[in-house]
Amino acid sequence: SAASDVYKRQIEYCQKEIVEKYGFQKISHIIEGGAERYHSVYCGLKAIKGADYVLIHDGARPFLDEEIIKRNIQAVREYQACVAGMPVKDTIKISDEEEFAAATPDRSKLWMIQTPQTFSYELIYQAYRVLITSEENTAEPEQTLPYDSLLNKQKVKKLQENRGQVHVTDDAMVVELLTDIPVKLVRGSYQNIKITTPEDLKIAEALCEKKQ
């Protein structure tokens, strides 16, 4: 199909123009992604074999450092699920539909969530498997959804009832939606920025110059 040809060309480009060109040694596989970020994550999870833990990281966050990785690995061994983040610096307002301030949450309890987001492999794989399966069918959950002891059966059923209405924005949310495992917050870094806008790129360039 045309879509398959596009994916094939993209994978070949990544292999030749990025991995081989720059001599990266730690890339074991380049995996075809999906329509949304979380679909791509699931594709990656299915390709992993024999892992105890998995760190899921945004490629748009190039300033990840070794200490953040170490803190994540230490935490996941104890808690099964953790995410990097930092306390917010600004006051946050919740907006209503007309962009008036509806509420002001306690800033001392708010964190900006980053990546990596780190989990026991079996936990995050089973949670994602149910999430993706729930999107792909319209039958009753008892008949169709895979169930694992790591998951909360009532939450699984609720997901199926609300299919199409759940908007997943990070990996921890999948664990929160479908399990009773609390997600530990681990210190990231204010420099662990996500490059999304032209302004972010300018900040990233300044950070690169500082590190040189």
Regions flagged by a language model, labelled:
Residues 64-186:
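Conserved core of the sugar-phosphate nucleotidyltransferase
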Residues 2-7:
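Short, small-residue-biased leader/transition segments that mark boundaries at the very start
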Residues 37-41:
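Conserved donor sugar-nucleotide recognition element shared by glycan-biosynthetic enzymes
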Residues 191-212:
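Hydrophobic helical membrane-anchoring modules
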Residues 23-35:
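Conserved donor nucleotide-binding strand/loop of the catalytic core
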Residues 44, 57-58, 87, 120, ...:
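Residue-level signal for inorganic ion chemistry
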Residues 42-53:
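Active-site nucleotide-sugar/metal-binding loop of Leloir-type enzymes
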Residues 11-26:
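Acidic donor-binding segment of Leloir-type glycosyltransferases
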